[in-house]
Amino acid sequence: MTDATTISPLDQARILSEALPHMQEYDDETIVIKYGGHAMGDEDTAKAFARDIVLLEQTAINPVVVHGGGPQIATMLKRLGIVSEFAAGLRITDAATIEIVEMVLAGSINKQLVGYINEAGGKAVGLCGKDGNMVRAVKATRTMVDPDSHIEKVVDLGFVGEPDKVDLTLLNQLIGYELIPILAPLATSKEGQTFNVNADTFAGAVAGALKAKRLLLLTDVPGVLDKSKKLIPELSVKDARKLIADGTISGGMIPKVETCIYALEQGVQGVVILDGKVQHAVLLELFTNQGTGTLIHK
């Protein structure tokens, strides 16, 4: 991106003028941001993201951040000699793995991001879905077709869960005190078992419960692409379902779009899939006329 020192004062004024109506639109609204992908491993990008979150809070927006951590979990498991298997895009999580997942997500990544935001002048609080029984989960189930027998079988994913209930008591208190919640995607069952939850799914459940103005899913790709690999800037739910059916939306993008649809059905006003590797992607989406990424709406 262009360095700020090369922008003329007049251009800087125009940028601020363009941002004003968007700031007014989001005044006192809640924005849930899922921060993930390999951009999390780049310190400069992570710190730029933290500054952007503080800017949102300073402009009377209520940001709630949910972070992932797949690459960092993989690195730690490899260091400890633990081999991971995946099924239907989800990490099969046994008893040994869930301990490492919780350590990396709730301990390392969460507190690092809290530190970056506080360093930038914000007041962030690091939590996971277990805190205050914020997010209850049920065991996730997936089916796969056996390549030899062609019979569909249920896959045991271990301690992988899906959100079942979100209690907003703690989140609403934090937002009311102008604190910035930073959430690791861990949850507990009603029996007290810890579950690893896909970060996109977790963010969608939280955004839906909060009836957020926007859910932003930061990923490693520019957004939803058409068959010629060009960005689709805007999609209705109906069109998104058509693109899944005809194979335009495929692979790992399918569960992301399904999360978007779920969040919209729960009351979120708009969901955007955008590239988290682009510095200030959140600001570009919220405060410019052209935005960035793919907006999905009803």
UniProtKB/Swiss-Prot annotation:
GO terms for cellular component: cytoplasm. GO terms for molecular function: acetylglutamate kinase activity; ATP binding. Keywords: Amino-acid biosynthesis, Arginine biosynthesis, ATP-binding, Cytoplasm, Kinase, Nucleotide-binding, Transferase. Signal peptide: none annotated. It catalyses: N-acetyl-L-glutamate + ATP = N-acetyl-L-glutamyl 5-phosphate + ADP. It is found in: Cytoplasm. InterPro entries: AceGlu_kinase-like_sf (IPR036393), AcgluKinase_fam (IPR004662), ArgB (IPR037528), Asp/Glu/Uridylate_kinase (IPR001048), NAGK-C (IPR041727). Pathway: Amino-acid biosynthesis; L-arginine biosynthesis; N(2)-acetyl-L-ornithine from L-glutamate: step 2/4. The record marks K34, K256 as: Transition state stabilizer. It comes from the Bacteria. It is an enzyme of class 2 (transferase). Substrate binds at G69, G70, R91, N196. One of its GO terms (biological process) is arginine biosynthetic process via ornithine. Disulfide bonds: none annotated. Its EC number is 2.7.2.8. Its main location: cytoplasm. HAMAP family: ArgB (MF_00082). Catalyzes the ATP-dependent phosphorylation of N-acetyl-L-glutamate. Belongs to the acetylglutamate kinase family. ArgB subfamily. This is Acetylglutamate kinase. It comes from Bradyrhizobium sp. (strain BTAi1 / ATCC BAA-1182). The lineage of its organism: Bacteria, Pseudomonadati, Pseudomonadota, Alphaproteobacteria, Hyphomicrobiales. The gene is argB.
